Regions:
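Acidic, proline/glycine-rich intrinsically disordered inter-domain spacer in sigma factors
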Residues: 10, 114-168
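Residue-level preference for hydrophobic side chains embedded in well-ordered alpha helices
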Residues: 37, 41, 45, 65, ...
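Amphipathic, Lys/Arg- and hydrophobic-enriched alpha-helical face
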Residues: 38-56, 71-72, 167, 173, ...
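Helix-turn-helix DNA-binding module
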Residues: 152-153, 157, 161-176, 180, ...
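Short, Lys/Arg-enriched C-terminal cap helix and immediately downstream tail that follows
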Residues: 2-6, 99-102, 170-175, 210-224
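Short, charged helix-capping/linker segments at alpha-helix termini
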Residues: 4-5, 27-36, 46-64, 222-224
Length: 224
């Protein structure tokens, strides 16, 4: 096998042109290409699977997903990006495992627009408009920058931990959406494709998730 330790940038970014190169290398048995792909996506896969499963089960599902990728790569037709295809396999296996363990409902059952609308909302003026050229739907007033003193750096680390705690406390559906949108920085279309939700529902769920995380962070600073 070729001794390839990493993917070229275009391929690592998951574009369609790069996808073809990666798929060809995987089909040819390029171990280096597979390891690079595994290193690139496994952390995000584990975070997503952990939205529904305990850590040990999530790790097993990630391993099962990679085995399925290797077995199914010759059947990959390129109708979606390679990344979307991999994460769709992960999502399906996560749902199956979670249902088998009696831990949760399918994602579609968790996304209830009427229940989302009934939740306490944050003033819409606190968000940038949908047509904002750079940061649509993001907070209009971001948190102020922290300084460089040891105390301020400690506060930054503590606040990051508090943000993760707030994300971990979200309902499964909201946790998945905010993880993919804000932690992994996926495009909305990719999130909708992998999770099987509409663009409208994705926006609603993300808004609710961000609102809860923001409230938790504001409470943290009030108490700090």
């Amino acid at each position: 096998m070729p001794d390839t330790q990493e993917l070229p940038p275009a391929e690592a970014d998951g574009g369609r042109e790069g996808d073809r190169g990666v798929v060809d290398r995987l089909r040819a048995g390029d171990e280096g290409a597979f390891v690079a792909l595994l290193d690139r996506h496994s952390p995000a896969m584990l975070r997503l699977a952990s939205c529904h499963l305990p850590h040990a089960s999530a790790e097993e599902v990630v391993q099962e997903t990679w085995l399925a990728v290797l077995k199914g790569i010759r059947r990959f037709e390129g109708r979606s990006s390679l990344k979307t295809w991999i994460f769709s396999i992960l999502t399906n296996r996560t749902k199956t495992r979670a249902q088998r363990e009696g831990r949760t409902l399918p994602f579609s059952a968790l996304v209830n627009p009427s229940e989302e609308a009934a939740e306490p909302s944050v003033d819409p003026t606190r968000f940038l408009p949908a047509d904002h050229p750079q940061w649509p739907h993001h907070w209009a007033t971001p948190p102020k920058s922290w300084g460089e003193s040891p105390e301020e750096r400690l506060l930054t680390r503590e606040s990051q931990a508090r943000i993760q705690q707030a994300i971990d406390a979200l309902p499964h559906g909201q946790r998945q959406v905010i993880t993919l949108c804000d932690v992994e920085e996926w495009e909305p279309e990719e999130v909708c494709s992998v999770l099987g939700v509409t663009r409208t529902n994705q926006r609603v769920i993300l808004h609710r998730a961000r609102s809860k995380v923001r409230r938790a962070l504001e409470q943290y600073f009030e108490d700090a």
